[in-house]
């Protein structure tokens, strides 16, 4: 058995690290199979040497996030634990250094996982970036944040957000209300990120000035989109023809981000996904990046991560037991 203590800088920091009713400490105990004792600003672990060392590394990662004013929610603590198991907790400092934008309420936006950081770096470095991954990985929200940052710094003169009109089995014709209401209904998820970043009043003014456009994918046909930050969301529900049409709308001074989840295709049976097609066809082209986020990058409720993993397992074909070779009769 080994024993190791961590002396935190203040009672306030200790309270944040320990969590409400010591919930973070209990999580560390359960995940690393150690015993923890909290006294003032001191946290002492007892257990197997490698488990104690990993628990200390996880606390180091939590301290790093606190220094960057990142709230220690359960999912954040679990991510620290995941990195500590691989000895990568020091890489959390990289997240602190990567500032994206500030919300309308003054909250700074940083990547919450190393996968998200890779995604942001790809967007900065490339003209077209594909962000592929399950729900909850922040791929759309971070793309919107990067678009707002580019707009505010005058790198682009407008923001365009679009998505195909097929999702969860619905088409615009089957939604209630007039066409504008139908558009608003299925494009609403794209509004949320913009309103959070800009505030409702600023967002509305920019829409009226046509500096922000949120429209169905069909509205992109026949246009050349210059000097714009363009985001195609739910791209798994495009056909190959739609994807080609969209990508070839890109004009001078524009940047494109395409987001989607290849496991959630809602197209009619036997219709190929334009996203899957594009990922294959455009692989290796300079200026086009592909970033794959995983369940480790899910930053919603911890159950979302487990749900994603369960569905991924269910999607895998069952393993067949090896068949015994038929016995041959001796001549």
Spans of model-derived segments:
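Interdomain "pre-motor" coupling segment immediately N-terminal to P-loop NTPase/helicase cores
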Residues: 37-96
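Conserved helicase motor core of SF1/SF2 NTP-dependent helicases
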Residues: 42, 104-116, 122-232, 236-331
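Short glycine-/aliphatic-rich beta-strand segments at the starts of folded cytosolic domains
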Residues: 1-16
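A short, structured beta-strand/loop element
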Residues: 29-37
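Short amphipathic alpha-helix segments
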Residues: 13-30
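Hydrophobic side chains in well-ordered alpha-helices
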Residues: 17, 24, 55-58, 243-246
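Conserved loop-to-helix interface motifs that mediate assembly, gating, or partner/ligand docking
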Residues: 86-114
């Amino acid at each position: 058995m080994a024993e190791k203590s961590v002396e935190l800088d203040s009672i306030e920091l200790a309270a944040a690290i320990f969590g409400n009713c010591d919930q973070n400490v209990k999580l560390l105990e359960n995940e690393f199979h150690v015993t923890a004792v909290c006294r003032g600003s001191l946290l002492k672990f007892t257990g197997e040497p490698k488990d104690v060392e990993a628990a200390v590394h996880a606390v180091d990662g939590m301290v790093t996030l606190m220094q960057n004013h990142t709230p220690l929610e359960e999912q954040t603590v679990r991510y620290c634990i995941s990195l500590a198991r691989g000895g990568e907790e020091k890489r959390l400092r990289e997240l602190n250094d990567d500032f994206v934008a500030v919300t309308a309420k003054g909250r700074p936006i940083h990547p919450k996982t190393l996968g998200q950081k890779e995604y942001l770096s790809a967007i900065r470095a490339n003209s077209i970036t594909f962000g592929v991954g399950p729900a909850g990985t922040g791929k759309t929200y971070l793309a919107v944040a990067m678009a707002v940052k580019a707009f505010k710094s005058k790198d682009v003169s407008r923001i365009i957000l679009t998505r195909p009109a097929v999702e969860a089995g619905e088409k615009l014709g089957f939604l209630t209300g007039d066409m504008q209401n139908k558009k608003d209904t299925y494009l609403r998820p794209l509004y949320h990120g913009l309103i959070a970043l800009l505030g409702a009043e600023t967002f509305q003014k920019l829409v009226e000035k046509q500096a922000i456009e949120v429209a169905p994918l069909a509205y992109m046909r026949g246009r050349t989109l210059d000097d714009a930050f363009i985001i195609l969301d739910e791209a798994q529900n495009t056909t190959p023809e739609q994807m080609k049409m969209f990508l070839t709308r890109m004009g001078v001074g524009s940047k494109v981000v395409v987001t989607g989840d290849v496991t959630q295709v809602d197209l009619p049976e036997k219709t190929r996904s334009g996203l899957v097609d594009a990922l294959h066809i455009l692989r290796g082209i300079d200026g086009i990046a592909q970033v794959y986020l995983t369940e480790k990058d899910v930053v919603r409720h911890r159950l979302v991560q487990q749900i994603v993993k369960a569905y991924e397992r269910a999607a895998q074909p069952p393993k067949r037991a090896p068949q015994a070779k038929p016995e041959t009769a001796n001549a």
